[in-house]
Swiss-Prot record:
Oligomeric form and interacting partners: Part of the 30S ribosomal subunit.
Pfam families attached to this UniProt entry: Ribosomal_S11
InterPro entries: Ribosomal_uS11, Ribosomal_uS11_bac-type, Ribosomal_uS11_CS, Ribosomal_uS11_sf
One Gene Ontology cellular component annotation held by this UniProt entry: ribosome
Protein name listed in UniProt: Small ribosomal subunit protein uS11c
Gene3D superfamilies: Ribosomal protein S11 (3.30.420.80)
Record-level GO BP terms: translation
Span list, region Disordered: 1-22
Keywords attached to this entry: Chloroplast, Plastid, Ribonucleoprotein, Ribosomal protein, RNA-binding, rRNA-binding
Encoding gene per record: rps11
Amino acid sequence: MAKPIPRIGSQRNRRINSRKNARKMPKGVIYVQAGFNNTIVTVTDVRGRVVSWASAGTCGFKGAKRGTPFAAQTAAGNAIRKVVDQGMQRAEVMIKGPGLGRDAALRAIRRSGILLSFVRDVTPMPHNGCRPPKKRRV
């Protein structure tokens, strides 16, 4: 016999969700993935478990506006606002990708009040691997 599906607002579900939100985390890692079309900001604890994330698309930007620096700044602000409420004070920043949102996201992270222990560029660089896509002719 299948288990009954718990009600949405049940006591058990409320207890689980409150435990997840109550987790204090003084240190974390912020990953910024800046592509030409979108910027994704992921915040994890030191063990690598995702605590919060945001992208320019989830912040309401559509189409070509997702690749703009302002969209990256908004996404970084939204992702960090959640973890500052949980008590994050120090963070390491890993930036990946060639997009326009790299600097804007880093600026938003610095402005949030979190102390940055280091900022590392982890953009993958080929040692002459795959052939790149052809250049655009406009």
